[in-house]
Amino acid sequence: MSNFSLSLKDAQDVAIMSPTGYINDLGAERLELTSEQYLGKGLRKIVINFSHVQFINTLGVSIFTGIVQKTMDHEGQLCFTNMKKIHRDIFETVGLIEHVRVFKDEKDALSYLSDRD
């Protein structure tokens, strides 16, 4: 399945990534590369909006683990928003939720991050 696209925007010092479709090998790799580019540019606050994510396969989950680790290595903050219950349950099962902040929507995540340095 290659039904994937990625929308990007910045809100002050926060990078917002909004994937659409299936997060499988190519989609997950694009998310990982984009997050690495943001971290490499010195952006330490990243929001991933899951509102248009339909499916995440096991490779996608493992790449999210890498994104979480790299964000932690850069002393960054990673927030997930608009997660469907099934996606949240998967991330809870593999322990990723312990290392990110989950918010109902982007507005809540941006409000939280605006209070952080």
Regions found by a protein language model. Name each.
Residues 109-117:
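A short, charged, amphipathic alpha-helix used as a generic interaction element across diverse proteins
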Residues 83, 106-107:
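Short, ordered loop/turn segments at secondary-structure junctions
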Residues 25-99:
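Amphipathic alpha-helical interaction surfaces in cytosolic regulatory modules
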